[in-house]
Amino acid sequence: MDAIKKKMQAMKLEKDNALDRAAMCEQQAKDANLRAEKAEEEARQLQKKIQTIENELDQTQESLMQVNGKLEEKEKALQNAESEVAALNRRIQLLEEDLERSEERLATATAKLSEASQAADESERARKVLENRSLADEERMDALENQLKEARFLAEEADKKYDEVARKLAMVEADLERAEERAESGESKIVELEEELRVVGNNLKSLEVSEEKANQREEEYKNQIKTLTTRLKEAEARAEFAERSVQKLQKEVDRLEDELVAEKEKYKDIGDDLDTAFVELILKE
């Protein structure tokens, strides 16, 4: 009887211990499940961060493509501007050559005008000499009448020549005015071309500044892509570590659940043994 009681007490103690171990296993299983859920939540958050970083990387790459497109457009604009500058230089050279020819024609016209003026002066002096002689030689008027007529004829011829010279002079002056107008027009055109050249130069400077800024932005985008790539690799590494941690925790949960099942089976066996012992005790009494 004492042996049975001791056995029952031992079995009860073992049952209590089994219950404690089962409770502890259940608590450990709950803790492991909480850790697993937390790890899964962290893994989901990391996955979201990875997705966000990938989206940022895509946007950055798209921005880089846009910047490269703009750079190509600016390079084309720069080439067009250089072509325009070359064309303007050719036009300026042609205008300079035209101006030189105009100056040569102007110099020729000026020389002809000077010669015509000298001829007109000489004719005027000859006419005055003839008139002075006719007035001074009144006593010899009869004798010199024929000479006077001839002098008048010469004077008329001189007048005709003077009129012809004056007409030619007017024509030369008109040619000179046209040459001056062309020279002024050429100078105005040169000023306009110089202004266009200055504007093109400013545009080239602006394009160079824009290109430098675009290069800086491209370098910044490259650095940003490099940083995002590093962050993506780190996030992937953390995600892999979290997945491994979840797998380890899941294995730990499975192990604790197996231990819990084993403890429950053991508890059931102890319960069966106690029931058998009670039955035997009752039968002996």
UniProtKB/Swiss-Prot annotation:
Residues 103-133 are annotated as: Disordered. Residues 122-133 have a biased composition (Basic and acidic residues). Pfam families: Tropomyosin. It comes from the Eukaryota. Residues 1-277 form a coiled coil. InterPro entries: Tropomyosin. The keyword 4Fe-4S does not apply. Keywords: Coiled coil, Repeat. The molecule is in a coiled coil structure that is formed by 2 polypeptide chains. The sequence exhibits a prominent seven-residues periodicity. Homodimer. Belongs to the tropomyosin family. Tropomyosin, in association with the troponin complex, plays a central role in the calcium dependent regulation of muscle contraction. This is Tropomyosin-2. It comes from Bombyx mori.
